Amino acid sequence: GLNFPNNAPGLYIAPFKNDLVVIMNTFKNMNEKIVVEDVPLNKWINVIIRVEDENVDVYINGSIVKRHVLDSVPKQNYDDVYMSMNGGFSGYSSNLWYYDYGLGTTAIQEIVDNGPDLKMIGEDFLGSKPRYFSLRWFFNNTDSNNQSYGGF
């Protein structure tokens, strides 16, 4: 389920689908939704959510896959930042960074180029699955306002 009341931003995996759902609180709309469809499973992916003024850009592995203009100014979340609430997901998180400014494309690419931190507490995690995914995925994400999620 959604965290309440603060989602500025909130990042969720859609139930029963491999879609990412970004939720932003604004002063006009409590939960503006941006859907990134058909995200590859069982692969490391880098997700960057950049908010500047009323514009939200979602990057996957350094490529912008969604651009969304909010209905109004986003609400700033002054509370704690939570990860993997309500049971989380069956996967791993590598790093979480929160900046007080919108990163430029060079900084975004540097983060992607550095890759995930594969060092787990007490052991190394080097998966045997390839770290790439089909370019076809990039061409199938065009609608940022998918309305098909009952709880989202």
PLM ranges: what are they?
Residues G1-F152:
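Extracellular glycan-associated modules
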